[in-house]
Every structure is written in structure tokens, then in C-alpha cells.
Amino acid sequence: MGKKKKGCLRRIGCIAIVVLTPVACIAAWVFLSWPDVSALARENPQTTAFIEAAKTNGDRVEWSWVPYDRISIEVKKAVVAAEDMSFFSHNGFDTHELKIVARDAVKGKKVRGASTITQQLAKNLWLSPSRSPLRKVREALLTWQVEQSLSKQRILELYLNVAQFGPETYGVGEAAGRYFGVPAGVLSADQAAQLAAGLTRPSSWHPGVSSRGYSAAVARIQDRVSRCDWLDKLL
């Protein structure tokens, strides 16, 4: 083999090393830091990424866990109606909502959120608030894995127990006690709508707040729930 050809091969080899080494490092990092999603089928999380971020910021965290069968069906209906009407029919991603978001973006309209309950759960449990491309890839992969590993009821139980329902307040059990002085299992339809309405803005929207926007959100959820009798069979 001539010197010229050997030199060319060496250069190709060097380029390959330069290109592949970062890829290998990223792959190793992803593999080593990847959570055991399937474990959530048999055990509850001890903390979440969002809770740890709040603690890092010096925020107080009040959090308690309530099993699925001890959570009022009114809360389950209100949260599904407010956050993800297609929860029981999609595989983690609501393609219909994504199409609407894409259409509105093209038209220059205000873009609404299109995250499903499963996506929100993945973000709450494992991801930072960052919107980097790598984080979005991790979110998509984790969302898919959650849907493959857990039942819809378990996904909803996890979400209701890790979501933020107000300042320093995590989980529906903590929210029920703080705002209404009752266990999560006896929350009424009206109380459930008030809790669900604050999920998009937990720092500023929660029971007891005087806000036109919050009151309108509560009313919208109550209207949706009144037209969702079919949810009773799935919850």
C-alpha cells in the first residue's frame, strides 16, 4: 500500500475517532443515567426532578402519597378533562393536539401546550425545565417507555401524586388537606375542578385565589366534566 493511501486512511481514522468519541460518550451518559421505568409498576418514587429542583432553589416542599383507590373519582375526571382528554386512547402522544399546535404556529397564533399526562409525568419525574433538543429526545423516549411499562391507571396515580397543585404543594393528597381540610378520597366535583384548574400555573392559580382567569378555567373544566360520563367506566 502506498504512503499516500496509508496517509489517507490515517486521516479517515482520526476523523472517525473525533466524530464517534463524543457520540459514544453521550450514549454512555444516557445509558448510565437512564431511570428504571418498569420499577414504577411496583414501587412509588421517593422524589422527583421537579421536587429536587424546588429544594435546590430553597423552596419548601410539602408532599404526601395517596393510593389510586383512595383518590376521589371526581379528581381523576377533572384532571383528565383539564389536561388530556385523549389520555385513555393515545400511546403517550396526542397527534391531534400536535397538529393543532403546528397549524397555530404556522399561522402565528398563540401556541397552546400539547403535552399529554404521560409526557408531563416523565418531565416531573426525571427531567429539568430545559428545552434543549437532547432533553426533548429524552422526554419522548421516556414517555414511550412509561406507556409500554405501566397501565393507564398507574400513570394517572403517579401523575396525581407528583404534580404541583400550588406553592410548596405536591400531590393531590397534600392539596386536599391544605386547601379543603379533607382527604383526597372525599373531594367534591367543585373542589376537584379547582385543583385541576391550577395545574398549568401552580404558583399563582390554586383554591382561594381571586383571579378571573383562574375562575374561567375552573368553569371550563366543570363544563367538560359534565360532558364526559364515559370517563366513569375507565377510571
Give, region by region, the residue ranges found by the protein language model.
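Juxtamembrane regions of bacterial inner-membrane/periplasmic proteins
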Residues: 2-235
